[in-house]
């Protein structure tokens, strides 16, 4: 018999009754029933009930066992007594009568329990992550992640893609966040950077003639902590294709992402035909470039109904041509209590409040706004936005560039409060026609709005002749249930157009050559049209596992202060290490 086990703890069935076996694993829990000890033994594969009675030679040692001891036990498989089956366990019809126990690894007092669903402070869980990972739900999440990545690989290979690994030590580039820098010992004063994404390398692969690339790529960004992003590193399904249009990328990737969701959705419906929503439309209808389309509410502009009306606050605002009034329909929300609750919520979000109209029996509008603008305008609003008796609508006014995010939050809040958002499905969509540039208020200059390597719609001609803030890019996102889960674009592969695109954003040609020398050189020697995307593995796994915390689907994540509490990173370097790297630490003044 094998030194440690003949079977795993999830393998034994009724067909094994009568066999002498050996198991190894962790003591999940010990129960004493009238002097007979029941030991639940657990490993990666499952759990088996083991029985030790006072007649067993192993009894004296079994009495000393505690949770999370690692043990080996020999025994005989037998049928559980009638009425004691556990249908929740694959091994629930059998048990092991134990004849011998060996302790392989004793366990001290546990800083957090493995058995049970008790909530513990996150810092404790991260410091003792090896214990946390033994807990059933987290262990399942990690294995679901493994299977999702396997599914992604299988589907990408089925679409004719080849998996390549790109360098981890590379050059710094402006991807939109700070780089993690690595000092070079061999080249004093110079630094490598960990890749924020394999963007340039995957484009270089297309110029090298490999046609279709993918990898599960680690990416590193030195960003301030955010609730929807893990600090430090994350993983993406990175993709690039040669000789393709935007439609070709969509046709290749929709079945991959849809297939992964269908495989792991646990029966929840997954949208078959993805909607394509222009960026500007997404902001206007949903107040977000990653709208939750499970919520049926669509906002509408209703400025004309308030222009010159008796509601002077909105009427005066609309004298400025850039200002608008948007309506957020609230089906079933026509009660004073709900409207007051939404008003209080808005004030908690730093807003002066939310104007509203409720529609009573007979279609009569009620509330301060309705009283100020009169029945004719109230009826016209109702007709435009399609509400009925018992419904309400909330109104947001001002410069849409400044209020669209809040209006999106209000739409989400209404959907949640009125149970309009269907939580039992996955709604996928493409967001298209992103602006190529945006105005950076802090730096008072035009800047790239997203990926600087995207092809502008209209090409070089648009870059030379259009107002930069009106240029759209061949750039797209995939959204699911209010999350951006992928982003991509058709690349700007024309050297002159690349230089012009960066020039508009304030980069001179020499700076482009210096910072993107490898790719710029490659463009001079025959670059194919190409495009691709990157899908966030972590967010996809998070959605499919039904959690909202990325740490619940990651093996060894950092905390929100970007600290690895298990390994003690970041840590100070020794004087010797710093000298070898020719680096001096200049700490900020306290």
From Swiss-Prot:
Q: Any keyword Metal-binding?
A: no
Which top class of enzyme applies to this chain? ligase
Supply the EC number(s).
6.1.1.23
Residue numbers spanned by region Aspartate: 199-202
Q: Which GO terms describe its biological process?
A: aspartyl-tRNA aminoacylation
The UniProt record gives the binding positions of ATP as: 221-223, 484, 536-539
- Which Gene3D superfamilies did the record assign? Bira Bifunctional Protein, Domain 2, GAD-like domain, Nucleic acid-binding proteins
**Where's it found, cell-wise?**
Cytoplasm
Checking InterPro entries in the record gives: Aa-tRNA-synt_II, aa-tRNA-synth_II, aa-tRNA-synth_II/BPL/LPL, Asp-tRNA-ligase_1, Asp-tRNA-ligase_1_N, Asp/Asn-tRNA-synth_IIb, AspRS_core, GAD-like_sf
CDD domains per UniProt:
AspRS_core, EcAspRS_like_N
Give the positions of the site Important for tRNA non-discrimination.
Answer: 33, 83
Q: Which reaction does it catalyse?
A: tRNA(Asx) + L-aspartate + ATP = L-aspartyl-tRNA(Asx) + AMP + diphosphate
* GO MF annotations in UniProt: aspartate-tRNA ligase activity; aspartate-tRNA(Asn) ligase activity; ATP binding; nucleic acid binding
Question: Which keywords label this protein?
Answer: Aminoacyl-tRNA synthetase, ATP-binding, Cytoplasm, Ligase, Nucleotide-binding, Protein biosynthesis
Q: Does the record bear Nucleotide-binding in its keywords?
A: yes
Instruction: Write out the residues that bind L-aspartate.
Output: 175, 221, 450, 491
Annotated Gene Ontology cellular component terms:
cytoplasm
Assembly and oligomerization? Homodimer.
> Per its UniProt record, what NCBIfam families does this chain match?
aspS_bact, PRK00476.1
Record's PANTHER family?
A: ASPARTATE--TRNA LIGASE, MITOCHONDRIAL, ASPARTYL/LYSYL-TRNA SYNTHETASE
Give the family per the record: Belongs to the class-II aminoacyl-tRNA synthetase family. Type 1 subfamily.
| Protein task | Aspartyl-tRNA synthetase with relaxed tRNA specificity since it is able to aspartylate not only its cognate tRNA(Asp) but also tRNA(Asn). Reaction proceeds in two steps: L-aspartate is first activated by ATP to form Asp-AMP and then transferred to the acceptor end of tRNA(Asp/Asn).
Q: What name is this protein filed under?
A: Aspartate--tRNA(Asp/Asn) ligase
Q: State the organism of origin.
A: Bradyrhizobium diazoefficiens (strain JCM 10833 / BCRC 13528 / IAM 13628 / NBRC 14792 / USDA 110)
């Amino acid at each position: 018999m094998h030194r440690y086990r003949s079977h795993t703890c999830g393998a034994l069935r009724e067909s094994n009754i009568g066999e002498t076996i050996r198991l190894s694993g962790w003591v999940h829990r010990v129960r004493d029933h009238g002097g007979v000890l029941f030991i639940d033994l657990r490993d990666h594969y499952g759990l088996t009930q083991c029985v030790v009675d006072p007649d067993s030679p192993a009894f004296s040692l079994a009495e000393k066992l505690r949770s999370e001891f690692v043990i080996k036990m020999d025994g005989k498989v037998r049928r559980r007594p009638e009425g004691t089956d556990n249908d929740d366990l694959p091994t629930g019809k059998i048990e092991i009568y134990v004849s011998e126990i060996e302790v392989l690894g004793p366990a001290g007092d546990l800083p957090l329990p493995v058995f049970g669903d008790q909530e513990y402070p996150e810092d404790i869980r991260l410091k003792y992550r090896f214990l946390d990972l033994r807990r059933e739900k987290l262990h399942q999440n990690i294995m679901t992640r493994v299977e999702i990545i396997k599914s992604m690989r299988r589907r990408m290979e089925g679409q004719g893609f080849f998996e390549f690994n790109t360098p981890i030590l590379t050059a710094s580039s402006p991807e939109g966040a700070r780089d993690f820098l690595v000092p070079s010992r061999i080249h004093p004063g110079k630094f490598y950077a960990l890749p924020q994404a394999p963007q340039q390398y995957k484009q270089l692969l297309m110029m090298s003639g490999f046609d279709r690339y993918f990898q599960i790529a680690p990416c590193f960004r030195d960003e301030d902590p955010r609730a929807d992003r893990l600090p430090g590193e994350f993983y993406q399904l990175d993709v690039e294709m040669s000789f393709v249009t935007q439609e070709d990328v969509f046709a290749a990737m929709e079945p991959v992402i849809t297939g992964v969701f269908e495989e792991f959705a646990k029966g929840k419906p997954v949208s078959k035909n993805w909607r394509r929503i222009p960026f500007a439309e997404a902001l206007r209808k949903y107040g977000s470039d990653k709208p939750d389309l499970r919520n049926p509410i669509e906002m509408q502009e209703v400025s004309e109904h308030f222009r010159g009306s008796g509601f002077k606050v909105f009427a005066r605002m609309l004298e400025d041509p850039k200002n608008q009034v948007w309506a957020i329909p609230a089906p079933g929300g026509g009660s004073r209590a709900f409207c007051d609750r939404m008003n209080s919520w808005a004030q908690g979000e730093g807003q002066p409040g939310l104007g509203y109209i409720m529609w009573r029996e007979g279609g009569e509008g009620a509330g301060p706004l309705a009283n100020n603008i009169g029945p004719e305008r109230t009826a016209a609003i109702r007709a435009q936005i399609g509400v009925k008796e018992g419904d309400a609508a909330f109104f947001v006014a001002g410069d849409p560039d400044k209020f669209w995010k809040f209006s999106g939050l209000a739409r989400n809040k209404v959907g949640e409060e009125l149970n309009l958002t269907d939580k039992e499905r996955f709604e996928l969509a493409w967001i298209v026609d992103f602006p190529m540039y945006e105005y950076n208020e802090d730096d008072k200059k035009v800047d790239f709005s997203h990926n600087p390597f995207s092809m502008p719609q209209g090409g070089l001609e648009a870059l030379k002749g259009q107002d930069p803030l009106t240029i759209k890019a061949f750039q797209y996102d995939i959204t699911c249930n209010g999350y951006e889960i992928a982003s991509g674009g058709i690349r700007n592969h024309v050297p002159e157009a690349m230089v012009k695109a960066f020039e508009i954003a304030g980069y001179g040609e020499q700076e482009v050559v210096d910072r993107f020398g490898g790719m710029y050189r490659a463009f001079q020697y025959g670059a194919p049209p190409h495009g691709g995307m990157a899908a966030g593995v972590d967010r996809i796994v998070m959605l499919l596992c039904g959690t909202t915390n990325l740490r619940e689907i990651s093996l060894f994540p950092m905390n929100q202060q970007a600290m690895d509490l298990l390994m003690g990173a970041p840590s100070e370097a020794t004087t010797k290490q710093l000298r070898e790297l020719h680096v001096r630490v200049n700490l900020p003044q306290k």
